[in-house]
Design a protein with these regions (language model features):
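Proline-centered turn/helix-capping motifs that create local helix->coil transitions or kinks
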Residues: 1, 69, 78, 82-85, ...
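Catalytic-site neighborhood detector that most strongly recognizes the C-terminal catalytic loop/helix
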Residues: 80, 194, 213-239
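C-terminal catalytic core of Y-nucleophile DNA break-rejoin enzymes
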Residues: 15, 73-75, 84, 94-118, ...
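Short, polar N-cap/turn motifs at the start of nucleic acid-interacting alpha helices
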Residues: 66-73, 204-224
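C-terminal secondary-structure termini that scaffold catalytic or DNA-interacting sites
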Residues: 5, 71, 82-84, 90-102, ...
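Gram-positive cell-envelope targeting signals
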Residues: 20, 57-61, 148-154, 190, ...
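Basic, Lys/Arg- and aromatic-enriched nucleic-acid-binding interface segment
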Residues: 1-56, 60-62, 70, 100-102, ...
Length: 247
């Protein structure tokens, strides 16, 4: 099923339900993008978001200098945000609020390294004009006109891609006389939670999960981990129950 996490990041915020895509949904979403002539240009940013768990501003602010493909790491040291300052809406660079936000994370999925390597190779040809912001340059992710990508841009893309995928999947399922495997409604924040879910399913090293996710508070990581493992236990119990007979 789709996991829900009843914890918002950061203390003092109301509890919210946050879904994580299942492994099947994740695969279907990325495969659809990679095969789509209309949406394939969205593949690099979606793969990096889903494969690193970066916050959206950490990802859209990534520069060529933040990526070390020899050591398979990404340095997270600034955010790209879009907000109104002095009555003018524009992009700004901010630095992480807490020490845990500044971190070097391992690249865990080979697909992330592949997408980043390909992007770095073509970026000079793709973007002849370098964007410079607060001394940062060599930004990896740009919109169609070569400017910065916003969370709003990515959310609109997710929505359009999901609608297109679901329409195609419903037609295909009808042809094959089966139940369609549809994507739920989700946004860019669910991509981070999806990564965190896969990480929690793969390791019980809470400190490692906290460092990769950049959670300031250990209890945030612990709450998410506990919730995800409980959900998994429920699913496993249902499967096993069907096979157990005492008498």
């Amino acid at each position: 099923g789709v996991y829900s996490c009843l914890k918002s990041e950061g203390s003092g915020k109301p509890a919210i339900t946050r879904i994580a895509l299942t492994k099947e949904q994740l695969k279907n979403f990325l495969r659809f993008i990679s095969k789509s002539p209309m949406y394939s240009h969205w593949l690099p940013v979606m793969v990096v978001l889903l494969g690193t768990g970066l916050r959206v501003g950490e990802c859209t602010g990534l520069t060529k200098n933040d990526v070390d493909l020899e050591n398979n790491t990404i340095s997270v040291n600034h955010n790209l945000i879009y907000r109104v300052i002095d009555g003018k809406a524009d992009f700004h660079i901010t630095t992480p609020k807490t020490a845990s936000g500044t971190r070097t994370i391992p690249i865990l999925y080979p697909e992330v390294a592949e997408q980043l390597r390909a992007l770095i190779e073509v970026m000079d040809a793709l973007y002849p004009e370098d964007l410079v912001m607060n001394g940062y340059h060599g930004f990896l992710f740009r919109n169609r006109s070569g400017y910065f990508l916003s969370a709003h841009n990515i959310n609109r893309a997710i929505e359009r891609i999901s609608i297109a995928y679901n329409a195609e999947e419903m037609d295909q399922a009808e042809l094959e006389d089966r139940e369609p495997s549809l994507l739920p409604h989700f946004s860019v924040h669910n991509l981070r939670h999806t990564f965190c879910t896969r990480l929690c399913e793969s390791t019980n090293d809470i400190k490692f999960i906290q460092q990769v996710m950049g959670h300031a508070d250990f209890s945030t990581t612990m709450d998410i981990y506990t919730h995800i493992t409980q959900e998994n236990m429920k699913e496993k119990a249902e499967v096993i129950k069907g096979n157990l007979v005492l008498m």
